[in-house]
């Protein structure tokens, strides 16, 4: 089958090669002259005629690059031809692109692709959205790209246009949570002196355990290549699909606390100094007299706490709102909260937890 492939980066280039290994004739175009087979989109379209059916796979960054490419193809292709968008477009963009092509009789499929740089040898997981007749036209392509074995274990026709990229979006949201769970486990193992072989623990988990996975295998490989992750920056970007997934969770009222925590951790990794945590540190110093660490490394010491200044809210009212009152069963809401509120001047009656190591006052915050 003759196929046009637009975008020959790490993914597109490997997909072209895998299709060629399966016997397909793939004509590739890329802005990089060293990668492409033809010099323009018109040349590509001319070279891929299959007795009246032309199939073009688009593998460029989502947003404007994808839309611009599809708009150009709309002027070059004719009724009965097919465009497959294999990048990471948002599913709402798929609906717009389909609406652009449909009046001309040009089919449109959105295909979420997973497998990364390993897909050339292992095959790609494919999630497709679109009309059944268009999926059938492209099935020889999908069968060549997916892993060997039963079709349903590496390919799904997820639904109508947009469903493929929606499924891939959720897939990536799950990926965020899985990666962060492994990352938290790694940090805790590395922090405890009793554990002497952290990479060995990860490797031992790779066979027979309930947490074994390909991501875990990749974590083992990363620790082999970079022991202790020495020199690896904590700065972590995001592709945008985690955000889209979380937005969908909000829209559909589906709780997604794991994804939210993983995504926000990536945001935090990019902050050299977090304004939010600077404010928390300053506030702890103000209301609890806790030591405040300054950016130059010196300890600013404890803030002097002046007694007698009443809070602006009605303390008795707050206790009543908590189900008690002065002398009632509800007790003092401050004591019930414990932790930060029970600062050095609070006395020893806090129920927040163990007594602090030096204050003898019930301060339990930030002790590891």
Task: Write out the residue ranges for each language-model feature.
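Rossmann-fold dinucleotide-binding core
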Residues: 69, 90-187
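Short linear motifs in low-complexity or flexible loops
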Residues: 300, 309, 315-318, 335-345, ...
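NAD(P)+-binding Rossmann beta1-loop-alpha1 motif at the extreme N-terminus of oxidoreductases
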Residues: 1-50, 54-55, 117-119, 285, ...
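Conserved dinucleotide-binding and phosphotransfer motif residues
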Residues: 22, 104, 252
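Hydrophobic beta-strand scaffold residues
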Residues: 26, 108-109, 256
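Rossmann-like NAD(P)-binding element
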Residues: 3, 31-96, 102, 120-130
